[in-house]
């Protein structure tokens, strides 16, 4: 085992407070720390300002404060090919993708990890709120971050055990408030910087406008599942299951929600009431399955699952259909399960892995109106 001072750790630095504190903590622990900034997207805004330039300037300032070397690496082509193309393809298919999951799988913990290892790094560290633990046999597990509100294992569900063996999450045991406090105590220039929100390549821009630049919108009818026309939609890709905002349906009674999509006829299905029965299901089929420790997964088992970020866990039964497909039965009916989103499985604090929601099931029947 190497001493810390002989162990090189490349820190993926975004210019935010989390990655800044991750680098600080590793430096304090005596590691040979190198900061690297990834440029994944040409994000010049409407005023000609490139936010990536501002973020890199913050990385430079923090690295100078910490007295560690820093570099920048460009993954724009890989990001376009592996993440953005997938993002557009999913929307074309009427689904609601999660680009953060794909970015972690293909860019941060693949292209970037390979780059770090090529630089002689022993580990790649990031500011994610998750934890890596070795069990008594030396096997690597991923645990939730201690800060329940910030835990990011949902977005890291596609990482393999081999990848996690080369990864450090220095913030995993800390609450966010403590991370801010550490940054202020050490007067890091990013201490007061607000957290980035939304999809990285959209930034603060209007989602509808952004998407329409790449996919032509096809307006069509809004109908109930009984065929009653309630208005028109701007394009199916702009709507997701359970959505209430932006439907423009007036009148009295309960509010209206998106309950499904018909891609063939370009119809957006709507239903009245938050508890609308059409929004509920009791099972799903997921594909693109990744198990962090696949040899420990049995053919059928009980665990908990999340169907969206920051959702409470739900009890489920998982049946393996093939290497790339699972059937997930819910103990209690779930509302607005959305194709394209991630389903992530847990055994207590341990993240088992996850997949992409493909098909929604109710009483043993596929819900065709979901898309």
UniProtKB/Swiss-Prot annotation:
Coiled coil: none annotated. ATP binds at residues 12-19, 38, 127. Pfam families: tRNA_Me_trans, tRNA_Me_trans_C, tRNA_Me_trans_M. Its main location: cytoplasm. Residues 150-152, 308-309 are annotated as: Interaction with tRNA. One of its GO terms (molecular function) is ATP binding. It comes from the Bacteria. Belongs to the MnmA/TRMU family. Catalyzes the 2-thiolation of uridine at the wobble position (U34) of tRNA, leading to the formation of s(2)U34. This is tRNA-specific 2-thiouridylase MnmA.
């Amino acid at each position: 085992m190497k001493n810390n001072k002989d162990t090189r750790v490349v820190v993926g630095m975004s210019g935010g407070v989390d990655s800044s504190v991750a680098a600080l903590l590793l430096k304090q622990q005596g590691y040979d720390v190198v900061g690297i900034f990834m440029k994944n997207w040409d994000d010049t805004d409407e005023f000609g300002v490139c936010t990536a330039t501002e973020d890199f300037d913050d990385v430079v300032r923090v690295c100078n404060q910490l007295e560690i070397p820093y570099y920048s690496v460009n993954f724009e082509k890989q990001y376009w090919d592996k993440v953005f193309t997938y993002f557009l393809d999913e929307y074309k298919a009427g689904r609601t993708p999660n680009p953060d999951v794909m970015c972690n799988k293909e860019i941060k913990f693949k292209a970037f990890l390979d780059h770090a290892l090529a630089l002689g790094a022993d580990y790649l560290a990031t500011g994610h709120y998750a934890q890596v633990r070795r069990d008594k046999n030396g096997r690597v597990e991923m645990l939730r971050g201690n800060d329940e509100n910030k835990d990011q294992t949902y977005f890291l569900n596609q990482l393999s055990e081999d990848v996690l063996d080369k990864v450090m999450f220095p913030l995993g045991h800390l609450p966010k408030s403590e991370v801010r406090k550490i940054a202020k105590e050490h007067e890091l220039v990013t201490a007061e910087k607000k957290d980035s929100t939304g999809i990285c390549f959209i930034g603060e821009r209007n989602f509808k406008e952004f998407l329409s630049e790449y996919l032509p919108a096809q307006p069509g009818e809004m109908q109930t599942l009984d065929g009653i026309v309630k208005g028109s939609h701007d394009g199916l890709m702009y709507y997701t299951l359970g959505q209430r905002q932006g439907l423009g349906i007036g009148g009295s009674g309960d509010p209206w929600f998106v309950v499904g999509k018909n891609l063939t006829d370009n119809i957006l299905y709507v239903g009245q009431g938050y508890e609308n029965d059409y929004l509920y299901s009791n099972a799903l089929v997921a594909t693109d399955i990744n198990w962090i420790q696949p040899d420990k997964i049995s053919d059928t088992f009980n665990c908990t699952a999340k169907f969206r970020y920051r959702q409470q866990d739900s009890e489920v039964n998982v049946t393996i259909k093939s290497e790339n497909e699972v059937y997930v039965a819910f103990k209690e009916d779930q509302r607005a399960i959305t194709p394209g989103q991630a389903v992530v499985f847990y055994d207590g604090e341990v993240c088992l892995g996850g997949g992409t929601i493909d098909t929604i099931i109710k009483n043993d029947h596929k819900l065709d109106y979901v898309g």
